[in-house]
């Protein structure tokens, strides 16, 4: 074995250790200064379990969002006293002791609105304000107004919000962008991280880390002042994602951090709890029971961690795409997450430089460079010719191509020759008449074929453009916009996901009905409208014919789903 080179390499190796120790202190400080609200399954114990198992409501999220009318301990005591009495009615007990969430009023757009006018009209409809909440409410208060996705999603969601904010910025609502960044900074200061959403039952996990990109977006309007203002919160979020790294040995994992055998540091998705999700209680219990060969707690953790990924659920996490109970999210190192961590490190370097701390900036650059090497070494499948996730159990890069493979291009972490191969793979395997497929596998899960999701369309479009692959990028935008326009023309709404095997149809699959609104679709649609139309002639609807200045590629024929990986 070679001895380590003296001097500079040893010194550089110390940098991450120093910075991680500082971050560990930040993480502890955040935990010590906040009181974590308890989720409803803990507050209500057996009552929560009994109500959810009784399936009193079509959507399990309904009772998770219900507000106790008095101290939960008193309600629970009353329940224990009454539950075995003759004639006890559980539904009546719930109606007396809880305030159920109200269904949002169905928005009816004015006649004759263009697509752009419809989206601009929706921003105030989707805006919420919860500076104060009821004492035992699962909803977490936020100091500023925020935009929700829509439908059953009555709270703000972490990674959704970035793509919503792109649209808000496109509409000139920089005040709303600033408010939402302030809200997420507030959550970092109070909870040590940004939860999945502002609900107590989401506090045990985060979502794809877009906060640094949100600050970077705000800096387009406010300049470096935004970077300087939110540097402390960006550092705290980084500490959350890297928590435990200082004690890791090669080949070990701790929470969200993975240390491979050669010392490479990467990240994975993780939820701190290993119980059924309150918002999907019955479904999770059924999934765990369907595979008696695995501990239920292991399945619960992997279900929760998949929710943390934003891809809940997908064949991407499963050994058998037709069986959800084979998912093992925590043993997979995701290419999209590590691309976002690379971007976070780059933005932290930029923000450190903005405050004049060049030494700290260099440390972040060192971390980003190390992660980029890790992405190229472990998250590139050379045999297939695309980026993919790394499997901690097989110690190999996985073979499946997913839309997550475009994230290294989105954050400018990809090697140029590999970006070219990604363009070919995308066009060959994922591009459909209605946009970009999430995967090429039909599993019945919502983050699989034939569904296409707005954030992935934008990541692919921007990522490919970053590397000069404009033709494929514009193909994706044009196909997806056509899908959105056709659906809007028919139904007068934008939806959460789309069937990309055709145009004009919303997506299916998953644990709940198709939702409309819809925050991230609105944001991406506005960005794409302004991408395909000349600035001197902005369009309010998708043009009937594709602009000749862009690619002249003909619409693709529908592809059959590819074999299960």
Swiss-Prot record:
Pfam families tied to this protein: Trehalase
GO (cellular component) term, any one: periplasmic space
Protein name listed in UniProt: Periplasmic trehalase
Subunit structure of this chain's protein: Monomer.
Major subcellular location class: periplasm
Keywords: Glycosidase, Hydrolase, Periplasm, Signal
Broad EC category: hydrolase
Residues annotated as the enzyme's active site: 312, 496
Any GO MF annotation of the entry: alpha,alpha-trehalase activity
EC code: 3.2.1.28
Annotated localization: Periplasm
InterPro entries documented for this protein: 6-hairpin_glycosidase_sf, 6hp_glycosidase-like_sf, Glyco_hydro_37, Glyco_hydro_37_CS, Trehalase_periplasmic
Catalyses which reaction(s): alpha,alpha-trehalose + H2O = alpha-D-glucose + beta-D-glucose
PROSITE patterns: TREHALASE_1, TREHALASE_2
Family according to the record: Belongs to the glycosyl hydrolase 37 family.
GO BP field: cellular hyperosmotic response; trehalose catabolic process
Protein residues bound to substrate: 152, 159-160, 196, 205-207, 277-279, 310, 511
């Amino acid at each position: 074995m070679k001895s380590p080179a003296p001097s500079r390499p040893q010194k550089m190796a110390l940098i991450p250790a120093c910075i991680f120790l500082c971050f560990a202190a930040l993480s502890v400080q955040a935990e010590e200064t906040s009181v974590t609200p308890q989720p409803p399954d803990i507050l209500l114990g057996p009552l929560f379990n009994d109500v959810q198992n009784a399936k009193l409501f079509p959507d399990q999220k309904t009772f998770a969002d219900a507000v106790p009318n008095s101290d939960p301990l008193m309600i629970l005591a009353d329940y224990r006293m009454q539950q075995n009495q003759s004639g006890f009615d559980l539904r009546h007990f719930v109606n007396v002791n809880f305030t159920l969430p109200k269904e949002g009023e169905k928005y009816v757009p004015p006649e004759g609105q263009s697509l752009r006018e419809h989206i601009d009209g929706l921003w105030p409809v989707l805006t919420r304000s919860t500076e104060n909440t009821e004492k035992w409410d699962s909803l977490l208060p936020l100091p500023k107004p925020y935009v929700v996705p829509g439908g059953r999603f009555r709270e703000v969601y972490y990674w959704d919000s970035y793509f919503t904010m792109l649209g808000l910025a496109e509409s000139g609502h920089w005040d709303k962008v600033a408010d939402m960044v302030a809200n997420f900074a507030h959550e970092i200061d109070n909870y040590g991280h940004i939860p999945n959403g502002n609900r107590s039952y989401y506090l045990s996990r985060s979502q794809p880390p877009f906060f640094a990109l949100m600050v970077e977006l705000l800096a387009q309007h406010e300049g470096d002042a935004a970077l300087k203002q939110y540097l402390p919160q960006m550092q705290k979020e980084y500490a959350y994602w890297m928590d435990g790294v200082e004690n890791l040995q090669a080949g070990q994992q701790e929470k969200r951090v993975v240390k491979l055998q050669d010392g490479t540091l990467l990240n994975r998705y993780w939820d701190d709890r290993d119980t059924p999700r309150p918002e999907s209680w019955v479904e999770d219990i059924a999934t765990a029971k369907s595979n008696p060969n695995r501990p239920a707690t292991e399945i619960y953790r992997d279900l929760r961690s998949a929710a943390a990924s934003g891809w809940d659920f997908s064949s991407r996490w499963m050994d058998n795409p037709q069986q959800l109970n084979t998912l093992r999210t925590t043993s997979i190192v995701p290419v999209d997450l590590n691309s976002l961590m690379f971007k976070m490190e780059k933005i932290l370097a930029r923000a450190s430089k903005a405050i004049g701390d060049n030494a700290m900036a260099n440390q972040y650059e060192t971390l980003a460079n190390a992660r980029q090497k890790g992405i190229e070494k472990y998250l590139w499948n050379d045999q297939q010719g695309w980026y993919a996730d790394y499997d901690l159990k097989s110690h190999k890069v996985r073979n499946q191509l997913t839309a997550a493979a475009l994230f290294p291009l989105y954050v400018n972490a990809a090697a140029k020759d590999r970006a070219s191969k990604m363009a070919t793979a995308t066009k060959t395997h994922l591009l459909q008449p209605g946009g970009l497929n999430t995967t090429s596998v039909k599993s019945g899960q919502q983050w699989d074929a034939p569904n296409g999701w707005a954030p992935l369309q934008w990541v692919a479009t921007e990522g490919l453009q970053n590397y000069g692959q404009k033709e494929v990028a514009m193909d994706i935008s044009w196909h997806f916009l056509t899908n959105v326009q056709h659906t809007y023309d028919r139904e007068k709404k934008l939806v959460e996901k789309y069937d990309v095997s055709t145009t004009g149809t919303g997506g299916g699959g998953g644990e709940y009905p198709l939702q409309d609104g819809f925050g991230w679709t609105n944001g991406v649609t506005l960005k794409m409208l302004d991408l395909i139309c000349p600035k001197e002639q902005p369009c309010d609807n998708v043009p009937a014919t594709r602009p000749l200045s862009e690619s002249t590629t003909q619409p693709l024929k529908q592809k059959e789903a590819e074999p299960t990986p």
